[in-house]
Regions:
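Peripheral docking tails and interdomain loops at the edges
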Residues: 238-332
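Anionic-ligand anchoring segments at beta-strand to alpha-helix junctions in alpha/beta enzyme folds, i.e.
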Residues: 168, 182, 189-218, 335-374
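Short acidic, glycine/serine/threonine-rich loops at helix termini
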Residues: 7-12, 33-39, 66-69, 93-100, ...
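Conformationally flexible catalytic loops at phosphate/diphosphate-handling active centers
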Residues: 82-177
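N-terminal alpha/beta PP-like core and its mobile active-site loop of ThDP/TPP-dependent enzymes
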Residues: 3-56, 84-85, 105-107
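Glycine-/acidic-rich phosphate or pyrophosphate-binding loops and their flanking alpha/beta elements
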Residues: 163-186, 322-336
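Conserved thiamine diphosphate
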Residues: 38-88, 112, 261-264, 268-283
Length: 374
């Protein structure tokens, strides 16, 4: 992750260019810029989006369990390498009680013919081949474009594999997943752990009569416009796209630009006409993203002239792009017990809490979740 992942970029171009199926599991982290930083956002994976790797994203620990096999199975079948990423620290270091997928069920999903074909590509003196060739201008362009059909096939392969995983787990997965009011007028598009916070905020606002929703992006590359439009409510009027990275000098951050392009080039829109689309940035360097901040995002969408390319979660008193955020609220469901522990370095607070949550999760039928900020 972080600068370490960026060191792999030259190799990633070759891996993808030679159609070698592999999976990089990445706990997405900040790429150090003006200061050293080890915490979580999408800076590193966004720097790899042009390499030719397909990109799959999860928002919580259970999704990592369920969708990681999708990356492996689709890579093997489609001959396209994958980055399977989730938020560094917020997801990668969280303790959560999850349901495991039966290994026999996963083994049954394996495409044996694709596996055999992959192994047959190994270098072997019994059937010698030439690799690592150099190509001149007369042929390079054509052979580079020949990979198009492989990438065009990936979204359907991923969708089919997700459908099979959904049958096994009972949890529904698609390249894009919609959550919220079926007649929503204002929606957020995002990926990663923030979608869990947005879902709770959507429930809160719907209980107050507001027509809102969220689209979770699982398959980021290739960006499949067809699957995005399939889940888009026909009633939508305004969309906010949230990015967890900063691309200085660009007209917008990556996910925002992808969504805008998707609407601009779609053959038909479920909503009939082009909705207003704005973008915002949140959570750089593991900055906590709270329900109050997501309420601010929805409030911004209501304005006659919503702020575009905003930030949320900080006070920007230099370029004044930040949204005002109200008082923090708790959206825990009834029956939930929450606790916040404070400790000093090496005083045992973290270890004691880790042991406690594991004991509770392992010896009771209660759902447990724990996270630690250092």
């Amino acid at each position: 992750a972080s600068q370490g992942l960026l060191l792999m970029i030259p190799n990633m171009y070759k891996i993808a260019g030679e159609l070698l199926p592999c999976v990089f599991h990445v706990s997405a982290r900040t790429v150090s810029t003006h200061a050293l930083n080890i915490f979580g956002d999408h800076s590193d994976v966004m720097a790899c989006r042009q390499t030719g790797f397909a990109m799959l994203c999860e928002g919580n620990v259970q999704e990592v369990m369920d969708l990681s096999p999708v990356a492996h199975l689709a890579a093997l079948e489609g001959k396209v390498p994958f980055i399977n990423f989730f938020d560094g620290f917020r997801t990668s270091h969280e303790i959560q009680k999850i349901e495991l997928i039966d290994e026999a069920a996963l083994t049954a999903m394996l495409d044996r013919d694709a596996l055999k074909a992959f192994r047959a590509r190994a270098l072997n003196p019994e059937h010698p081949v030439t690799r690592g060739t150099a190509q001149n201008p007369d042929i390079y362009f054509q052979t580079r474009e020949a990979a198009n059909k492989f990438y065009e096939a990936v979204p359907d392969m991923v969708a089919e594999t997700m459908a099979r995983i959904s049958e096994i787990t009972g949890r529904s997965y698609k390249p894009f997943v919609y959550y919220g009011d079926p007649e929503a007028e204002h929606i957020i598009v995002a990926m990663g752990s923030v979608t869990e916070t947005i879902k709770e905020t959507v429930d809160y606002l719907r209980a107050k009569g507001e027509k809102v929703g969220v689209i979770t992006v699982h398959l980021y590359r290739p960006f499949a416009v067809k699957y995005l439009m399939e889940v888009l409510p026909a009633s939508v009027k305004r969309i906010c796209v949230l990015d967890r990275t900063k691309e200085p000098g660009a007209n917008g951050d990556p996910l925002y630009l992808d969504v805008v392009e998707a609407f601009a080039t779609a053959k038909s829109l479920p909503c009939g006409q082009m909705p207003l689309i704005i973008g915002g940035r949140y959570g750089l360097s593991s900055k906590d993203t709270t329900p109050a901040q997501m309420l601010a995002v929805f409030e911004n969408l209501k304005l006659n002239e919503p702020k575009n390319q905003f930030t949320v979660g900080i006070t920007d008193d230099v370029t004044f792009r930040s949204l005002p955020v109200g008082e923090e609220i708790s959206l825990a469901k009834p029956g939930t017990f929450e606790a916040l522990f404070f400790g000093l370095g090496a005083d045992g607070t973290v270890g004691a809490n880790k042991n406690s949550i594991k004991i509770i999760g392992g010896t009771t039928n209660k759902y447990c979740q724990a996270y630690f900020s250092y």
